[in-house]
Every structure is written in structure tokens, then in C-alpha cells.
A protein has these predicted regions:
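Extended ligand-binding clefts on enzyme/binding-domain cores
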Residues: 142, 181-185, 189-296, 303-314, ...
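CBM-like carbohydrate-recognition segments
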Residues: 32-79, 86, 91-98, 107, ...
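Extended ligand-binding groove/face enriched in aromatic
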Residues: 98-102, 108-233, 238-240, 349
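Bacterial N-terminal signal peptides that target proteins for export
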Residues: 1-11
Length: 393
């Protein structure tokens, strides 16, 4: 389903080499940045967003819901921001951002949350691996130790739990595996990254099998999109359309890009992931709204702007152009409109708005809504857009 008639015209490298006042957030006009070249302008905005978020890491009274989850320093919400910060650190070479990630890791002793098999608690490990790639041999061992223990325990006793998500609230029995689309961002890049960092193929083999299980359970081969979890396979939206949540697909698409960035070029499973990535890319380009944002429910146009899903999609598309997997003709119009939409969502102080709050389905969103994972998605997108723009003729 095409929702628009027309659109206007290293994390991986490091690992492989190592084997609040009241803000004003407006949809229009764009946040004010210096009238420089587009590559630099993307980084200027990314710095603004990163600096605002780093200055607001206490209290979280500006977050509408789930403040306790937001305050968890190794939980998925903060993890996504720090993953984005690693991308900005790589793009800028700014030691402030490098040290912010390292200081966060040191405060947490490079450890994890209390759930040893829950993908949400895996996500922070991507920042730990990045920091390990920037360390001395002794530091590296310390920064990888908890990650090895965590993943080795899963290898020693892999789960065969069914992938069905229950209707009850709270954690589900299937969440010892990747039975919801968000998990594809949280966990697979950690497994692929540890394989790259250590040279141990067992981690990548496990990732491959579990990722395929999630695709089998949740991927719609006709729409080339993911259901958030098994509850949504038979559900329909108010207009009768299948429900493909924007951020849920953003998690999956960004995770897929990050896995491809880490997977060896000659790996026998790489063609499988390339096919999945290209099919999703085409579907997502078709689903983009006329305003540059992706709708909160991808097959239902209209609704409010939303920046977390849009950020992940711009990131994944721009990464594909930079990696030579998508042609500029295919993807740049969508990237350009998506990045313009994201830019319009940054307030003068750097606060990112229009971020749907913590949830599991399409929901309402307002200009004042912000969250750390939205900022993380923005930073990931900015780093790739800047690289893409630096190569534009």
C-alpha cells in the first residue's frame, strides 16, 4: 500500500578491527541551525539533541509515563540513547561523547539488569562492546566479561519456548526468546557484535537461528513488515488494515541493519538478511507519509507526527545507501523527507518532540512527548545522514 504519491528529491568497524525547564517543541519551523552544508548541519542538530539529553539524565519529570523504567541505567530506554551516542561519538570524534559512554559503563561495572534472558536487558551490551573496542587489553577484558558470562549461559541452555505472546500484562513466558519485534534491535546486534569482537562463531550462529525464528513468527511476507508480537497477527485497525506498529518495525529494521553491519561478507546466511533488508526497505519507502514522517500504524495514513519510528527508518535507509545496499535513487528521497521531518521536531534547546511514549502498539503522541530512545534513534539517523551527505555530489 503506497501512502504517498511522491517524495522529494563505526560501531561495526571498531568491533571487527578489535577481533529541565519547560521546553518548547514545535512541528514548524525547523530548529535553527547554522546555514552550513547538509552533512555538518545534521551533526549540529545531533549535538544539540545529545547535549540536551545528557543534561537531563536525572529525575525524568519530563517523561509522561514509565519514569521508573526510564531511570534504569541498564534498561532498554537508556541503552538506546547510549547506542545512539556511540554513533555520534564515531561521527564527530568528540571525546565528550566517548567519555560519557565510558563513564556510564564504569558506573554500572559493565553489567546488566536482573533478567538474564530478556532482550530488553541485552541492549546495553552494544554500548559495552563499543567501549571495549576503544580500550587497552586489560580494560577490554573487564568490559567484555559480563557480556561473555551472560551470553555463554544462554548458549549452555538455549530455550525452546513457544513464540506466542500472551494477553496478560507484564512479562511473558516467551520473552526468554525474541518473541516481540523490539527484541530484534535489543539483542541480535549484541550477539553478532560479541562474535565479531571475540572471533567465536557460536554467538553468530545462535543469533542467526533465533532471528530466523522471530521472522517465522512475526514477519508478514506479503506486507514485508513485522507484527509487534503474535497478538497482532489477527487484529485489525479501525480502518480494517493490518496493524504494523511504526516503532515496532523501526526496532526490527534498525536491528537488521546493525546485524548486517557486523556479519561477515562471506557468511552463508548473509543473503537471507540482505533479502529481508531490501524487502523491508521497499515496503517502508512506500509507507512514508507525505509530511516525511511514518504514521504510527504503517498501513493507516494520517495521524500525528512520530519521531522514534521515523528516526529508526531514516537510520536504516541511510545506512543502506552508505553501505551500497540501496541506491541513492531508491532511498534518498525518503531519507531527505524523513530527515527534514525529524529536524522540524527538535526544539531550540535540543529537546526532541513527537516521541510516542513507552508502549506496544500505535498510540497518541504530542509535540511535547519525548523519550531517550527517540533521542537515540535521532542520533543514529544523524550519523548516517551526515555520512551520506558528505558523499553527495
Amino acid at each position: 500500500m503506497k501512502l504517498k504519491a511522491s517524495i522529494s528529491t563505526g560501531f561495526a568497524a571498531l568491533l571487527l578491527a578489535s577481533c529541565a525547564g519547560a521546553p518548547l517543541v514545535r512541528a514548524e519551523p525547523p530548529a535553527q541551525v547554522a546555514p552550513t552544508d547538509p552533512a555538518h548541519r545534521a551533526i549540529v542538530q545531533a549535538r544539540l539533541v545529545a547535549d540536551w539529553q545528557l543534561a537531563h539524565m536525572d529525575g525524568f519529570d519530563y517523561v509522561a509515563t514509565f519514569r521508573d523504567h526510564t531511570a534504569d541505567p541498564t534498561g532498554w530506554i537508556q541503552s538506546t540513547f547510549f547506542i545512539g551516542l556511540t554513533a555520534l561519538a564515531d561521527a564527530t570524534g568528540d571525546d565528550r561523547y566517548v567519555q560519557a559512554v565510558i563513564a556510564h559503563g564504569e558506573r554500572q561495572d559493565w553489567g546488566y539488569g536482573a533478567r538474564p534472558r530478556h532482550a530488553d536487558d541485552d541492549a546495553i551490551g552494544q554500548a559495552w562492546l563499543w567501549a571495549a573496542a576503544r580500550s587497552t587489553p586489560s580494560q577490554r577484558e573487564a568490559r567484555l566479561a559480563a557480556t561473555k558470562v551472560r551470553l555463554d549461559a544462554v548458549l549452555a541452555a538455549p530455550s525452546a519456548a513457544a513464540m506466542d505472546f500472551g494477553d496478560a500484562r507484564g512479562e511473558q513466558a516467551c520473552q526468554v526468546r525474541w518473541c516481540w519485534s523490539d527484541a530484534l534491535f535489543m539483542a541480535p546486534p549484541l550477539w553478532a557484535g560479541l562474535s565479531a569482537a571475540t572471533g567465536d562463531s557460536r554467538y553468530l550462529t545462535h543469533m542467526d537461528g533465533e532471528f530466523r525464528a522471530t521472522v517465522e513468527a512475526l514477519y508478514d511476507p506479503e506486507a514485508h513488515l513485522f507484527y509487534r508480537d503474535s497478538r497482532f497477527i489477527e487484529r485489525r485497525g479501525s480502518a480494517g488494515a493490518r496493524i504494523f506498529w511504526s516503532r515496532g518495525n523501526g526496532w526490527a529494521y534498525a536491528g537488521l541493519a546493525r546485524v548486517l553491519a557486523l556479519m561477515p561478507a562471506d557468511h552463508p546466511s548473509r543473503p537471507y538478511y540482505l533479502g529481508l533488508y531490501r524487502d523491508m526497505s521497499r515496503a517502508l519507502i512506500d509507507a512514508q507519509g507525505e509530511n516525511g514522517f511514518w504514521p504510527v500504524s504503517l498501513l493507516e495514513p494520517g495521524g500525528p507526527p512520530e519521531t522514534s519510528g521515523t528516526g529508526f527508518f531514516v537510520y536504516g535507509l541511510a545506512w543502506g545507501v552508505n553501505a551500497g545496499l540501496l541506491t541513492p535513487a531508491q532511498a534518498r528521497p525518503a531519507i531527505d523527507q524523513g530527515w527534514a521531518a525529524l529536524s522540524r521536531s527538535v526544539g531550540p534547546d535540543g529537546r526532541l518532540g513527537w516521541v510516542q511514549q513507552v508502549g506496544y502498539a500505535p498510540d497518541r503522541v504530542s509535540a511535547e512527548d519525548t523519550q531517550l530512545y527517540g533521542a537515540g534513534a535521532f542520533l543514529l539517523a544523524a550519523a548516517e545522514v551526515s555520512q551520506m551527505e558528505s558523499k553527495r555530489p
